[in-house]
Amino acid sequence: MRVGVVTVGEDSAQEVCDRLVQGGVEAIWSFAPGRVELPQGVMLKHAVIAGLVSQGADAADMGFCGYSAFEHGIRAFGYRGGMYIRMGDDAHSGEIVLCDGTGTELTGSCFRAFQQELKTGAVRPITTERLGIVQRVSGAAKSYDAHLNRLAQSVRSGPNGVTVLIGGNPETYDAVARVLLPCGYSVRYYTGLDSDKLFETAKEENTDLAFMADGMEGVMCAIAYGKHITRHELNAVLAMAAVKDGRANKLVLPADIPGEYVKQIADEGAEISVCPAKRSRWARAAIEAGAYLPELFEPEAKIIRAAELYLAGKLKEYLDGLPKVTINEKKVPCSWRDMGRVLRSFTEGERNEQIQLVDGVKVNVDKGWVLVRPDSGFTAYRVIAGSFDAEYSKELTDVYAGKLRAIAEDKEG
């Protein structure tokens, strides 16, 4: 979970560090800060390490690495938690992500508990406690490369004719290139930030696959066969391939993935459960269920597996085999104070046998489904509807958006 924006200069790094340590050292004993490169980030990292050590916590400096490598390192090296520092583009601000021992962000009640202790927790006296130990861990990136190489099934060979264009996070590009280039793929980096221009560039350069990746949130845009591939389509294809290859027989999927895709994957023999769609909660649920599939969560693994499916001729086969579901979405403004009342009234108005309460409220109807959930800023409700019938999908969106709007406007309800 993002603790907030840290601006080096307004608060000293040591003061930021002290406040973080006061709240977190009890819960996070063996701690691994990682991923900084700008001078301000390096200063903040060393201040955090100094504060942790002064409070008796052991700290492992994982150096500079991508977010997926950081998550993998937390799990592989057995740390109790971690802190990922990413500096902003302006070099004066950045964000800190706190992770637990599963390598996933602290969210919800876990974050609120940390935040509360951060504000009120006592500093343990250093005179009565041991000083922590600082360890330099230099193998995080190489360990993650080995993980990706095990995931890849291609053998080292000459050029295979497949060109992959990757934009966005440079660490994602570097990790993917280190795996795919020796296997004969052509891997290029796109320096722009606009997904639409990525599509144009991929078309102009006759690129087979193109991706816009964020190192923390995953693949934001995927292009193959001259068209955009939605994140749900890509996730469904990768999950289907893993089941058919015998790499997975149990999966955890996000609640907002179309039910038609879930049914098709389940028909292949997979045991499937659903969970909230937020990446950190989804990843944690998959890890706890023993159903973690790297390509569903790690952008590097996602790109590598998609490239290999393309090379094998299976990507198009799986994409063409997906049910043709049309998804529409609308937003209904709603005050955060009214969120609970509106959702409760909405749920009470639907038949019990039609609803699923996983990530908001999902209503299953005869020819489709509707998912109602708050947006990330808790300023509106998202109404997402899906159906084989495009017109019916739009109609569902309009009808349920109207229901929510009426409830939100009825202050007496």
Task: Walk through the language-model features, giving the residues of each.
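Phosphate-binding and adjacent anionic-ligand microenvironments
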Residues: 208, 225, 245-413
